[in-house]
């Protein structure tokens, strides 16, 4: 009886060690993507050769990790491109971005960035027939019910309630450009869109100052 128990114990240990050994050789979805991207690094770097096909394949590979993941690739600067790993503004996909970024390969021609970064506001944003330039949008902070969030009013020149949806999309894109994907999703709460004819317009600030003013308030939130 004692020998039987001892044999069962040995078998269990062997199985446990065997499963552990197998797990060492089984790659995660993130590791598989990194391996694939390293193998195809030059092809992706020169994506202009066949942009649609290469970008489609990139998206397919990312979706194997998480269906909400997406990417951005910058123009060449000093022999390098930026590769942005994005959750497309979906908070639930943030951990997937963090995990993939933690396994980023070291490639001389690439700089990997997690989440869409802040960018200087220089260009107008157009959706359908509505175009808003930086001078046509201003902001004002408001208190949010969630104390860990910052509420904001965006004043868009030309805004009407009938076209609220389009101007809301434009306003969100400006926020994303100004503050970056991470800060918008983590710290921006209520977003209200209004026109230049709103009674509080005179209290508004030019959109170019949004990052600086936001960071002043954010410091107090994350303490």
Task: Please place each PLM-identified region on the residue numbering.
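Classical Sec-dependent N-terminal signal peptides that target proteins to the secretory pathway
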Residues: 8-24
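Long, contiguous binding/interaction regions
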Residues: 24-81, 87-223
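N-terminal secretory signal peptides that target proteins for export/translocation
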Residues: 1-7
């Amino acid at each position: 009886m004692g020998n039987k128990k001892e044999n069962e114990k040995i078998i269990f240990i062997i199985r446990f060690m065997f499963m552990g050994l197998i797990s060492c050789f089984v790659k995660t979805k993130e590791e598989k993507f990194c391996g694939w991207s390293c193998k195809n690094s030059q092809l992706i770097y020169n994506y202009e050769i066949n942009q649609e096909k290469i970008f489609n394949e990139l998206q397919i590979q990312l979706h194997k990790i998480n269906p909400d993941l997406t990417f951005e690739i910058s123009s060449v600067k000093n022999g390098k491109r930026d590769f942005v790993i994005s959750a497309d503004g979906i908070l639930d996909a943030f951990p997937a971005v963090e995990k993939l970024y933690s396994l980023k390969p070291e490639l001389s021609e690439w700089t990997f960035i997690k989440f869409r970064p802040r960018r200087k506001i220089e260009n107008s944003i157009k959706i359908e027939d509505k175009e808003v330039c930086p001078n046509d949008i201003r902001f004002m902070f408001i208190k949010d019910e969630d104390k860990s969030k910052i509420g904001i009013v965006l004043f868009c020149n030309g805004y009407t309630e009938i076209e609220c949806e389009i101007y809301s999309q434009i306003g969100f894109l400006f926020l994303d450009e100004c503050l970056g994907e991470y800060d918008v999703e983590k710290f921006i709460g209520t977003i209200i869109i209004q026109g230049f004819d709103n009674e509080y317009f005179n209290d508004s600030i030019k959109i170019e100052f949004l990052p600086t003013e936001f960071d002043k308030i954010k410091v107090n939130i994350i303490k």
